[in-house]
């Protein structure tokens, strides 16, 4: 459940200043908001999104002093947005745990969790108003819109057997959009006008990240993943491992499981999906997205050291077990 596991001094430094920034810029006047904020921020996380933002900015030439003074708050803002989405998602999903700990809403209540999430969103936009520019605000706001749309679409499709197009529409919104904003803002911080290509990189990385998340839901270690195996299917959600082997399954049985949340029928489907190769097919699709991301990396003017680190991150995304 921890951060990106690299023994690279540059990555370690960027992760360290991110942690310091997350504490520094979380300064609400109401103690309860601070308590909940510290609980969720202190609960761990990979910090991939802020790391990507800082790496792109650094690799495209942002000086260290500017990186610390003006770019770091933008990276922190991205992580606040991610944190806010987790607070809200756990309330919507009635989740019991998050990152191996009891979900915030179960400790502090739904109302406090939701409103703290609202504060985190507002604080992120405040940081962008102070340290960013108009285009950055547009990019991040668009990502938040897409996140909300993806979450609503997923919620409306619970209990239904969706097609592949709808699946990618959901994950491009709920997951990929914030990765895309992270890499695009990093490029914008370095005065790159063609920010869309950096958005596309983040989008493909985000797709791969969610695909692996969905694979881990079928075969991961519960302690490492931080939630029970088969949880998505149990909640009535169709994800790629299931879609990839659907032609070999009894559709009526699958539909019955999806439409009966929290029953026990999902366990049989989880085993069948694994036996039919659904997990490996999902990982293969993720590798395809990452290959497309690598091709983008080869086209952009990043320095060699940062390009190497980003390729390591792409390796981590597909090989991770949490």
Predicted regions and their residues:
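All-alpha prenyltransferase/terpene-synthase fold signal
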Residues: 1-322
């Amino acid at each position: 459940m921890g951060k990106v596991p690299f023994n690279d001094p540059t990555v370690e430094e960027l992760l360290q200043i991110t942690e310091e920034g997350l504490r520094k810029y979380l300064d609400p006047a109401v103690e309860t908001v601070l308590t909940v904020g510290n609980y969720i921020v202190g609960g761990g996380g990979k910090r991939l999104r802020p790391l990507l933002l800082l790496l792109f900015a650094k690799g495209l030439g942002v000086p260290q002093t500017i990186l610390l003074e003006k770019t770091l708050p933008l990276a922190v803002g991205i992580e606040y947005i991610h944190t806010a989405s987790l607070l809200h998602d756990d309330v919507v999903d009635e989740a019991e745990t998050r990152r191996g700990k009891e979900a915030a809403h179960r400790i502090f209540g739904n109302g406090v969790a939701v409103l703290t999430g609202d504060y985190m969103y507002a604080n992120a936009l405040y940081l962008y108003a102070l340290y960013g520019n108009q285009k950055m605000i547009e990019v991040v706001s668009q990502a938040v819109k897409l996140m909300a749309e993806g979450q609503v679409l997923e919620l409306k499709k619970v209990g239904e057997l969706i097609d592949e197009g709808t699946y990618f529409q959901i994950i491009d919104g709920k997951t990929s959009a914030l990765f895309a904003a992270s890499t695009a803002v990093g490029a914008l911080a370095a005065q790159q006008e063609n920010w869309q290509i950096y958005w596309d990189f983040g989008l493909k990385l985000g797709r791969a990240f969610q695909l692996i998340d969905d694979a881990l839901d079928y075969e991961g270690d519960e302690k490492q993943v931080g939630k029970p195996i088969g949880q998505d299917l149990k909640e009535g959600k169709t994800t790629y491992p299931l879609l990839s082997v659907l032609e070999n399954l009894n559709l009526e049985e699958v539909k019955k499981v999806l439409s009966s949340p929290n029953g026990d029928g999902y366990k049989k489907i989880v085993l069948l999906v694994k036996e039919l190769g659904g997990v490996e097919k999902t990982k293969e699709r993720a590798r395809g997205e990452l290959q497309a991301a690598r091709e983008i990396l080869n086209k952009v003017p990043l320095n060699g050291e940062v390009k190497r680190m980003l390729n390591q991150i792409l390796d981590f995304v597909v090989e991770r077990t949490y």
